[in-house]
């Protein structure tokens, strides 16, 4: 269910602004999206796992706040990220 180190490194390398960039909004949103996808798959197999459901909702809210921040500060990076991650643009 959790991302391993290799998957995280691959995501960071793809979305980082510069080398060893792990804190930018783009990287954080991409990592959250990967975790959300993983937990969503888990929830399809385990629909009664309510603690995972609450964790999923928390991650979705966190990603939503980060995306709102990125949209207001750097719209070009926001639109590029939405296209690459196949997310809805609100």
Curated annotation (Swiss-Prot):
Q: Which GO terms describe its biological process?
A: translation
The UniProt keywords, alphabetically, are: Ribonucleoprotein, Ribosomal protein, RNA-binding, rRNA-binding
| Cross-referenced InterPro entries | Ribosomal_uS15 (IPR000589), Ribosomal_uS15_bac-type (IPR005290), uS15_NS1_RNA-bd_sf (IPR009068)
Q: Which GO terms describe its cellular component?
A: cytosolic small ribosomal subunit
Which PROSITE patterns does the protein's record reference?
RIBOSOMAL_S15 (PS00362)
Pfam families linked to this entry: Ribosomal_S15
- A GO molecular-function descriptor: structural constituent of ribosome
Q: Domain of life here?
A: Bacteria
Question: How is this protein organized at the quaternary level?
Answer: Part of the 30S ribosomal subunit. Forms a bridge to the 50S subunit in the 70S ribosome, contacting the 23S rRNA.
Q: What is the role of this chain? A: One of the primary rRNA binding proteins, it binds directly to 16S rRNA where it helps nucleate assembly of the platform of the 30S subunit by binding and bridging several RNA helices of the 16S rRNA. Forms an intersubunit bridge (bridge B4) with the 23S rRNA of the 50S subunit in the ribosome.
Q: Which family does it belong to?
A: Belongs to the universal ribosomal protein uS15 family.
* Name recorded for this polypeptide: Small ribosomal subunit protein uS15
Q: Which organism is the protein's source?
A: Campylobacter hominis (strain ATCC BAA-381 / DSM 21671 / CCUG 45161 / LMG 19568 / NCTC 13146 / CH001A)
Q: What is the lineage of its organism?
A: Bacteria, Pseudomonadati, Campylobacterota, Epsilonproteobacteria, Campylobacterales
């Amino acid at each position: 269910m959790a991302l391993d180190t290799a998957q995280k490194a691959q995501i960071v390398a793809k979305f980082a602004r510069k080398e060893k960039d792990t804190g930018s909004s783009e990287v954080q949103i991409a990592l959250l999206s990967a975790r959300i996808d993983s937990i969503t798959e888990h929830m399809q197999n385990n629909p009664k796992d309510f603690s995972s459901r609450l964790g999923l909702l928390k991650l979705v809210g966190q990603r939503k706040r980060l995306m709102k921040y990125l949209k207001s500060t750097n719209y070009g990076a926001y639109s590029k990220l939405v296209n690459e991650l196949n997310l809805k643009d609100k």
